[in-house]
């Protein structure tokens, strides 16, 4: 193994070397575990360490390669997963103390796909309680690798921290209202939130069924896409998994963004983003234009109602997901999740239906916008990553700010690709996103990869 460890390789480059016998999966894994032992005490991103299981996986993979067998596209790649995905024989806590003894009997479809592709699963990662808003005992918040005093995101906090902190080569996360995008922004990761239905949710702990998306974190868009290409696709055990072919993401990475029509709503962004964020976005758009994209000014449909409607839709569906344990075990729930569940339980059918109708109207307006452009460029966070102290005093304005550029696209189900495009005066990451048409993740990947071929923000690493 290189002295630099797995962090020195791309996902596909590492897998090729393992498959060719130039590196062994066992050596790659031990190098990765050495980094975990060195860095994890400062980061606190892991709930369940899976190293012994991983060692058995790596040994089996090396034996197959020694016999001359063909192996999958993620051969030997160390990947960590958010602790909402079932792994047979291990607990799926979903960040909740009441689920510490909830032992999975089968594997999630995503886990099956990863292991069939040769990935080595190393850990189950930290998250907020019930995949929602706050970290609760016995599972503390992981620490931002750039600054322990700053927020690490929610709910896929462990996935963002582990990826940027060097605990894995790539990670699996999920998003319901911003839970991939916000940790990517807080920690400076590249990530993909695919279209709703692109990835099976079988064996995944549910927050809100029609809002939940499983996605990927990595150090580059190309790496995140390589992992997404493995976990995506139809699944007979999840009838909501779309019956659509998975794009050729390797071809997309090579294609570039020549001819892409990129929309930007300058007024909407200016109303919700500070100067540093807006300036960094302008620079990113200029790079994409230099790479061949055409930039067009657009008007995004009003998202004001969507931010708050998201909470109502999420609340009702979360109440359904927790009906076996709430309110029966109310004392085991934290205040944020309790508040959401109570909202869901008291909402009338007419109120909920009104939210669904507005949701469909918004989705239709976005779809109409995407007949004029291929993608939208926008921030993820419109303000600097907040401190942990500030997060203890969140108000409605801050909540709206967090969700302005995220949860409307969870209501609509449109895909997004997220990547770093700067750093602020405190040295913390600035991140932007490209949002596109349903099931056209490959267009976004092509543009994101083109941007990262021209810039090096995604290559910058915190000193640990």
Task: Please place each PLM-identified region on the residue numbering.
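An N-terminal boundary/leader segment
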Residues: 1-56, 66, 290-292, 351, ...
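Serine-dependent amide/ester hydrolase catalytic core
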Residues: 13-19, 268, 303, 322-411, ...
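Short, well-ordered beta-strand elements within core beta-sheets of diverse protein domains
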Residues: 13-20, 98-102, 212-219, 342-347, ...
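Acyltransferase
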Residues: 25-30, 59-62, 275-299, 322-328, ...
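Residue-level signal for inorganic ion chemistry
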Residues: 32, 54, 224, 262, ...
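Structural helix-boundary/capping segments
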Residues: 38, 112, 116, 164-271, ...
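Short helix-loop capping/hinge segments that flank enzyme active sites or metal/cofactor-binding pockets
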Residues: 74-94, 254-266, 313-367, 415-429
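Short glycine/serine-rich loop/turn segments
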Residues: 74-214, 267, 378-397
